[in-house]
Structure formats: C-alpha cells, structure tokens
Amino acid sequence: MCLRNRILASLFTFLFLCFLSAQLTAQAGAIKPDPLASEIDPHCRTRPIDLVICLDTSGSMEGLIDSARARLWDIVNSLAKARPLPQLRVGLITYGSPSRSNAANGWLVKQTDLTTDLDTVYAKMMSLRTDGGDEFVGWAMRRALDWMQWSNDPQALKLVFIAGNESADQASEVFNFRYVGEEARNRGITVNSIYCGDREVGVRERWDQVAACGGGSYSAIDMRCGTIQIETPQDKVLLELNLKLNATYVPYGSLGEAGRERQLDQDRNADRIGIASSASRAEAKASKLYDNSGWDLVDGVKNKRVAVKDLKGSDLPAAMQALPAEKREEFVETQFRARADIQKQIAEVSASREQFLRDARAQSSGGKQALDEVMIDALRTQAKAKGFKFD
C-alpha cells in the first residue's frame, strides 16, 4: 500500500510539473507592462536597475567568457541611453568550476555583489578561468536570489541573465529551476536564459523553460560572434579622449590610489582584448553610469558623497595638498568642467561610431546574434515594460 501511494504521489508531481511548464511556456513570449510603470514620474532623475550575470565557467565556456569580457561595456552603453537615467548595479556569479568552489556549494562562486563599481565587476570578469565541472542552473538561480542585496524600490528593474550549454535540469532534486523561477517572479525579479549553441538543442535541454518560469526571454547565441572586434574610424580618437578623461580623476581618501590603479588596469585589460573594446569602454566611462564616488573627488562632490572642506589634507592628492584651503574647491570645479567637456566630445564621436557599427554588423552577422545583442534586446524590452524610455 505504501509503495502504491508513493507511485501515485510521484505521478501527481510529474503531471503537475508538466502542467506548470506548459503554462509558463505559453506565457513566455509576452513581457507584460508593469502596472507601476504608469505611476512613474517622467521627471524622476534616476531609477534602479539591478543586473546579475550568471556565467558557466566549465571547460567548454571559454568563448562565453571572452564574449562577456568583450561586450560588457556595450551593454552598459545601451543602458546609458535609458530615461530616467538608470542607477545601474551589476553583480556576477559563476558556476560549474570545481577548482574555485566545492560540491556543497554547487560549484558556485559569488564574484561580486550588486555594485555600481563597474571596474570591479570587469576586473573579476577578466580574472575568470574555465575548467571542467557540473553546471547546476537551478542552484545558480537560487544563489542569485539569495546572495545579492537586491533593491527594495518597487520601481526597480531587477534582472538575472544566466548563460550556459548543458541541461538545465542537472541537480534539480536540490534546486529545481521551475520553483526557483516562480519565486523570482513573485519577488519581482526576471530571469532570462541564454543557451550557448543551437537554439533547438537549447529547447531540448530545457533552457526555454528556465526563461518561461522566470518570466524572461530565451535566446541562443554563437559564442564566436561576441569576440569579433569591428574596428571603426572613430576608435583612435576615443582612445585619445580617454587619456584626457583619465587626467580629470582626483583620487581621495584610503580608497583613492587603489581605485585609480584599478581604473587604469581595466583600461589595459580592455586594450588587450582589442581596440574596439577599448573604444566601447571609453564611451562607458563618459556616461553617467560610470560612477567612482567612492574614490574620485570629482564624482564624490558631484553626487554629494563627500565635501572638500570635510577632508583632511592627508586625504587629498599631492597636487591639492599644496593648495590653500580656499583654492581646493576651485581645483575640483576646474576638473569637473574639463571632464564634462571631454565627456561631451566622447558622446559625439561615439554616436558616429555606433552608426558605423550598425552598418557593419548588418552586413556581417549572417543572422547570428552575439551575447551583447541578445542581452540588450531583452534589457530594452523589459526596461520599456517597467516604464523606461530609450533615446
């Protein structure tokens, strides 16, 4: 009798999951507008966007990691065109790498919490290495919900993008992506899935259901597309402007010199990938999403994180320490004006570069999409449903 009850219970659970999957798949194609979006003040200056990226770092995913490194700044640049201006925070989780985690933790690593410090995220991304391992999609989704300090703002756009190429049902007895996806939706977090390979194979591996359960979009990419560097006539101009932009940063406090060195390190990392990545990074650095208030005095004063008069002389760079107190604020104001002028020049050159890239990609893509393209498409669709508009 007990055996019969267990069989009936298992059958009921299987049928329920089939029904739930069918219902969610049917709903996946349409992103419904958020009812709160109509209440958004169009004059609101900023609104939060929390973006968590979960990357498979198992042995076959080198192309995915390279795509993420090459295209992070393109994704930032797309969001910089949203209105109201996003207050962007990015978090990074990796899964499937046994040398950097353990079985008890599902082979997952929290690389960064949600942060506005995009250079820190990029530095972590550049340090990633792949090796063989098990890829537990449901577990990665679970940790994305639990590990990150998500915004409590009801008007925040909260997104997860999870990318990989193995069955999404691995270790489902521990964390089933169907239940985790439903919880994410109930918490206002949208889960998008990206399969690295053929779209139909991704469907067989249940990656479309990951997005369906999480209320997001399913995409399949050719990992090689994301690493192609398209050079433009504007790239060298942007690199020259980037050097001038760097000269306007004023490190302060205990984090100042480390922050400045990290910024320069990430310039060098982008340069190693290619001139196109460096140009995209220069555009991102000139946007309002690139905020270094924690270590740069110009950003800190502009965003009211710090006041020059409250800082001790030892907290200031040598160039400012030599100035009388009344001249220090004038020094920061001069740097602010110089930066604003350079940012304007970068924006103008970047607009021409973007048109060149659109034309080049239309001719060369062959219908295949890269990582940044599918992420940007989903981001824009879901941001518009939340009340954002794009230039």
Protein language model regions, located:
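Divalent cation-coordinating acidic motifs and surrounding scaffolds
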Residues: Q27-G226, T232-D235, N303-G313, A319-Q321, ...
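Bacterial N-terminal signal peptides
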Residues: S10-Q23
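Bacterial N-terminal signal peptides that target proteins for export
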Residues: M1-F12
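A general alpha-helix detector
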Residues: D315-L316, K327
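Nucleic-acid enzyme cleavage-core boundary/entry regions
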Residues: C2, A22-A28
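Alpha-helical, heptad-rich or low-complexity scaffold/stalk segments
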Residues: I53, E326-K327, F331
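Eukaryote-biased recognition of electropositive, low-complexity segments
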Residues: F177-G181, R187-I189, E200-N303
